[in-house]
């Protein structure tokens, strides 16, 4: 009976899709959750610093039209 419970517990743990991520992974979140770590920032992004993996921390540029909206 104990083996059955152990087998069931192990199978449930293996069934879950746990994300395995490296500390030095590309597209890691940086900048207080607002930016991404990349080897090179894209054309629509600003470089705001460095990530722990020495890649650039890239923040997406704001759309000017969204910042100047006024409600009627």
UniProtKB/Swiss-Prot annotation:
Keyword Oxidoreductase among UniProt keywords: no
Gene Ontology terms, MF aspect: chemoattractant activity
Location in or out of the cell: Secreted
Cysteine-cysteine disulfides: 30-57, 37-51, 41-58
A GO CC annotation given for this chain: extracellular region
UniProt-listed InterPro entries: Beta_defensin_dom
Keywords for this protein: Antibiotic, Antimicrobial, Defensin, Disulfide bond, Secreted, Signal
One GO BP annotation of this record: defense response to Gram-positive bacterium
Induction: Antimicrobial activity is decreased when the sodium chloride concentration is increased.
Tissue and organ expression note: High expression in the testis. Gastric antrum exhibited relatively high levels. A lower expression is observed in uterus and neutrophils thyroid gland, lung, and kidney. No detectable expression in other tissues tested.
Positions in coiled-coil regions: none
Signal sequence segment: 1-22
Protein task: Has antimicrobial activity. Synergistic effects with lysozyme and DEFB103.
Family membership: Belongs to the beta-defensin family.
Protein name: Beta-defensin 104
Organism: Homo sapiens
């Amino acid at each position: 009976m104990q083996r059955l419970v152990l087998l069931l517990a192990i199978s449930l743990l293996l069934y879950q899709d746990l994300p395995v991520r490296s500390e030095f992974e590309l597209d890691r979140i940086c900048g207080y959750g607002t930016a991404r770590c990349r080897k090179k920032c894209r054309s629509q992004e600003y470089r705001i610093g460095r990530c722990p993996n020495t890649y650039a921390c890239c923040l997406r540029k704001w759309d000017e039209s969204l910042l100047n909206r006024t409600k009627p």
